[in-house]
């Protein structure tokens, strides 16, 4: 592979964190969100995601807006919206097995939301406990807080608790 210049490699998305090194990561929406969203930054961050080999990128944002930009830059994506009114148990029962399948098939997965907040962090903690990577909810919460460098709030903790009620991963 040819050596590429710094700008050809793109820029790392804001709040990018590895959950499992070179396997699963999370970040803020490429380009930022709200008043901080920038089109050029979005493009540079999607280029970085592509250059790192992520496939697919899973967006949990309610709207599919801007996902077409990933298509234009050759990045495979999945839209799995997680709204404020979503039943957490139903959502996790569908999302977690799909994520496990992608990881088992050796896909390098990036999950993003509007921000690296309770929803993304809670999904991480949920996966850790549901998949059996962490033996208990408190251990999953503690590891998630270390991995994301943020404290889990009520929504994130509830997601982990709900994951404990689901049938365990096969």
What spans do the regions from the language model cover?
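Cys-dependent protein tyrosine phosphatase-like superfamily
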Residues: 1-110, 123-170
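Glycine-rich nucleophile elbow surrounding the catalytic serine of serine-hydrolase chemistry
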Residues: 117-123
């Amino acid at each position: 592979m040819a050596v590429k210049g710094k700008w050809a490699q793109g820029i790392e998305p804001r709040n990018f964190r590895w959950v499992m090194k070179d396997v699963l990561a999370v970040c803020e929406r490429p380009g930022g969100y709200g008043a901080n969203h920038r089109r050029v930054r979005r493009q540079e961050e999607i280029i970085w995601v592509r250059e790192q080999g992520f496939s697919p990128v899973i967006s949990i944002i309610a709207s599919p807006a801007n996902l077409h930009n990933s298509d234009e830059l050759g990045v495979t994506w999945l839209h799995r919206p997680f709204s404020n009114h979503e039943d957490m148990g139903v959502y996790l029962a569908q999302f977690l097995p799909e994520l496990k399948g992608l990881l088992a098939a050796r896909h390098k997965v990036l999950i993003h939301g509007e921000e690296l907040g309770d929803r993304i962090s809670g999904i991480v903690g949920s996966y850790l406990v549901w998949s059996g990577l962490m033996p208990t909810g408190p251990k999953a919460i503690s590891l998630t807080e270390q991995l994301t460098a943020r404290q889990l709030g009520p929504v994130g903790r509830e997601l982990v608790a709900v994951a404990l009620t689901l049938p365990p991963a096969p």
